[in-house]
A protein has these predicted regions:
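C-terminal regions of proteins
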Residues: 209, 215-218, 232-288
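A substrate-binding/cap region within the structured catalytic cores of diverse enzymes
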Residues: 97-217
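N-terminal, post-signal-peptide region of Sec/Tat-exported proteins
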Residues: 50-83, 89
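Short internal beta-strands
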Residues: 84-91, 254-257
Length: 288
């Protein structure tokens, strides 16, 4: 009990320290920019988010400021319209366990046992999930189970044809469109030490599955806020590209996270990366 209280106190102190930075410390911890490199604000991001159908919040998985802003944005969107949440961090076949936790039929220990939680879940995602639980918000487990993405990486997309029908519900409906010439997938080919053609395919099946999950659960008039790694939606590709393929009429807003040594201006390489780009001081400590 003492350790739990101390952990909560540390979280509160950390959040307060961020507020102090925002309220006037000379050394800023983060800044927002538009895709054209113009300095902007959280207030404008919030205003634009309220008008979107879908918001893709691209994060650095170990960045505490991104995680804090995810919670803040969720809170600020409460009550405006029907709010639906979704996250890369939960895989489709863990939906029942996640629902059980949100509905109170299983506790945290049960969720730990039944779901494949990320190693940084308790520090980085539990506050967001618990907010959803308190506010009775649904969270959609959007991602493909990792073992199927690994199968694509090792053997290519054709390996999915061997899956039994009972397992195909965990992945995007086949066949799905794939464009290996998209710039983000091209970068992955260059980064790959092994199977350079298969690596972007494994990424694409994640992107396509998450997009299908989002579009399937989105309801007209609602707002869907989705958390994912920045690479999954940067430069209006990945999840964004697949959502556009599925429904070109959706109003989609993208957020990306970036680390820089200076917050004075946006790096030219990041122009066009997202509608709003969260730039964090590169000296910011990571959660792992």
């Amino acid at each position: 009990m003492v350790n739990s209280k101390w952990s909560s106190m540390k979280n509160i102190l950390f959040i307060l320290s961020i507020f102090l930075c925002v309220e006037g410390f000379s050394q800023e911890a983060f800044a927002f920019f538009t895709q054209n490199g113009k300095r902007t604000s959280y207030r404008k991001l919030l205003r634009k988010s309220k008008k979107a159908d879908i918001v893709l919040f691209g994060e650095y998985h170990n960045n505490p400021i991104a995680h804090w802003l995810e919670v803040k944005l969720t809170k600020d969107l409460l009550g405006k319209r029907s709010l639906i949440l979704g996250a890369e961090m939960f895989e489709r076949d863990n939906q029942d366990a996640l629902d059980g936790y949100l509905q109170g039929t299983i506790d945290q220990k049960g969720l730990d046992t039944l779901a494949r939680l990320w190693k940084n879940y308790k520090t980085d995602y539990k506050p967001w999930v618990d907010l959803a639980k308190r506010e009775k918000l649904p969270i959609v487990a959007t991602n493909i189970p990792r073992k199927y993405a690994n199968l694509v990486y090792k053997k290519g997309l054709q390996a999915l044809d061997t899956l039994p029908s009972a397992e195909r519900k965990w992945i995007v409906s086949l066949p799905f469109p794939y464009d290996g010439n998209l710039s983000q997938y091209e970068k992955m080919k260059k980064m790959a030490r092994h199977n350079p053609e298969n690596l972007p395919m494994a990424q694409a099946i994640k992107d396509a599955t998450m997009a299908e999950s989002i579009e399937t659960h989105y309801k007209k008039g609602s707002l869907f806020l989705h958390l994912n790694g920045s690479y999954h939606s940067d430069f209006f590709q990945g999840i964004y590209w697949y959502l556009r393929k599925r429904n070109p009429n959706l109003k989609i807003l993208t957020i990306s996270t970036l680390s820089q040594s200076s917050l004075k201006k946006l790096s030219s390489e990041a122009y066009g990366q997202a509608d709003f780009i969260l730039v964090v001081d590169e000296d910011m400590t990571g959660s792992y």
